[in-house]
C-alpha cells in the first residue's frame, strides 16, 4: 500500500516505470507481481495518526478478504507526510509485514521548533494549521503532539522498517529520521536507514534513484516473497 493524502485524481494517470525520486514505483512493482493499492485519507483536526489508521488499516483488512491478495504479506510505503504516516501506523497495528518510510517526522515535539532549511520558514505553522492539523500550539496540546509522534509509541512496534532520510533535506530535518532509527535500534527492533549524502528531500541524482529502487525491491521481495535478503 502506498499513500500520502488523496490519490483518486491520479487514478487514470500513466505512471512510467522509471526510477522515482522517492515515491513507490507502482508500475515496476505491479510488473513484478505485486498488487498496489493507494487509499485516499481524509483528516480531522488533532488526529492525523488516528485518521490514517482508520483509512489505511480498514482498506488493508478489506483487501485481505480478496482471493487474489495475500493478506499475510502486505506492506506500506510513504514519503514525507506519507513517511510520517508509515512510522505512526507501525506503532498502531501489526497487520503489515514490512514498511518503508522516506523523510518521516518521528517526533512532532522536537520538529515543531525547527525551520525548513531550504526556505528558513519556521515549522510551527505546519503542525498547528496545515498538513499535521494538530490545531493548537505545542504548549496548548502537548498530549496531541505526543499522541501523534511515532517515537513515543515505538515499544508497540513489531514491523521491520527501512528509513530513507538525506542529510541535505530542506523540508524535513534529517535528524527526524535519525530519532526514529536510533529509537528502534535501542529497542532491538529491525530497522535500516539510508542517507544519500548531499541529496535533498527527494532524490535528484539518477544513480541514487536507481539504487533506492533496487534496495526497495530487495527489501519487499525478502519479507513478502521469501527471497534471500540483500547482502
Task: Enumerate the predicted regions with their spans.
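Active-site-proximal cap/loop segments of hydrolase catalytic domains
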Residues: 1-6, 12-231
Amino acid at each position: 500500500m502506498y499513500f500520502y493524502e488523496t490519490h483518486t485524481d491520479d487514478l487514470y494517470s500513466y505512471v512510467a516505470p522509471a526510477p522515482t525520486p522517492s515515491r513507490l514505483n507502482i508500475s515496476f512493482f505491479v510488473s513484478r507481481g505485486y498488487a498496489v493499492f493507494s487509499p485516499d485519507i481524509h483528516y480531522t483536526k488533532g488526529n492525523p495518526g488516528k485518521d490514517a489508521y482508520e483509512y489505511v488499516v480498514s482498506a488493508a483488512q478489506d483487501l485481505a478478504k480478496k482471493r487474489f491478495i495475500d493478506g499475510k504479506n502486505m506492506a506500506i510505503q510513504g514519503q514525507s507526510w506519507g513517511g510520517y504516516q508509515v512510522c505512526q501506523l507501525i506503532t498502531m497495528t501489526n497487520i503489515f509485514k514490512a514498511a518503508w518510510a522516506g523523510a518521516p517526522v518521528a517526533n512532532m515535539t522536537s520538529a515543531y521548533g525547527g525551520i525548513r532549511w531550504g526556505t528558513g520558514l519556521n515549522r510551527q505553522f505546519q503542525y498547528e494549521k496545515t498538513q499535521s492539523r494538530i490545531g493548537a500550539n505545542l504548549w496548548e496540546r502537548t498530549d496531541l503532539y505526543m499522541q501523534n509522534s511515532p517515537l513515543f509509541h515505538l515499544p508497540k512496534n513489531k514491523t521491520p522498517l527501512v528509513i530513507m532520510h538525506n542529510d541535505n533535506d530542506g523540508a524535513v530535518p534529517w535528524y527526524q529520521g535519525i530519532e526514529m532509527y536510533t529509537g528502534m535500534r535501542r529497542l532491538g527492533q529491525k530497522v535500516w536507514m539510508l542517507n544519500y549524502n548531499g541529496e535533498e528531500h527527494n532524490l535528484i541524482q539518477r544513480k541514487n534513484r536507481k539504487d533506492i529502487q533496487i534496495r526497495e525491491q530487495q527489501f519487499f521481495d525478502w519479507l513478502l516473497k521469501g527471497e534471500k535478503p540483500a547482502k
